[in-house]
């Protein structure tokens, strides 16, 4: 059983085919390198794998659970798709923080942006943000950075 199964992923921007029938399996513990020239679709593939871009075709499964099936997606705001985005992340080659933000603000930025899509966000913004900030503090504490929350 593959930990990650990517089957026939396609992505088009207008009439330009960026990804065509990309398929691979990744076993637990394996490392995968995605290599290609500038503009070859590497970043687009990664964005599709963590649901920042919606593929036009194909499936993505993790531990035999289909997380994405292009034939099942209604829109970018599909609730299930939004929920799946919360479980994926991307580590960039050049790691940067926003220097104007505190450690807590940097850690919680993505989750706060995603929270704006929640159906009850406007009514419960303060409560939702408080939960996100508590989660961010827990993450910083796990990394030994509890004393750096406001730095």
For each feature predicted by the language model, list its residue ranges.
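Conserved structural motif at the start of ABC-family nucleotide-binding domains
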Residues: 4, 19-21, 85
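Short coil-to-beta microelement around the adenine-binding A-loop and adjacent beta1/P-loop entry
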Residues: 16-17, 82
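The feature captures the beta-strand-to-loop junction immediately N-terminal to the Walker
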Residues: 35-37
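Helix-to-loop junction immediately C-terminal to a conserved catalytic motif
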Residues: 50
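Conserved coupling/switch loops of ABC nucleotide-binding domains, chiefly the family-specific signature
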Residues: 56-59, 63
């Amino acid at each position: 059983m593959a930990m990650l199964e990517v089957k026939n992923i396609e992505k088009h921007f207008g009439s330009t085919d960026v990804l065509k029938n990309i398929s691979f399996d990744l076993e637990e513990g394996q490392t995968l390198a995605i290599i290609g020239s500038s503009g070859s679709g590497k970043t687009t593939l990664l964005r599709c794998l963590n649901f920042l871009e919606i593929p036009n075709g194909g499936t993505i499964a993790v531990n035999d659970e289909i997380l994405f099936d292009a034939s099942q997606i209604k829109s970018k705001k599909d609730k299930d798709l939004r929920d799946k985005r919360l479980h994926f992340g991307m580590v960039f080659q050049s790691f940067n923080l926003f220097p104007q933000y505190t450690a807590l603000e940097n850690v919680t930025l993505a989750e706060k942006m995603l929270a704006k899509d929640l159906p009850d966000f406007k009514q419960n913004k303060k409560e939702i943000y408080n939960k996100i900030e508590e989660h961010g503090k827990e993450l910083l504490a796990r990394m030994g950075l509890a004393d750096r929350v406001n730095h």
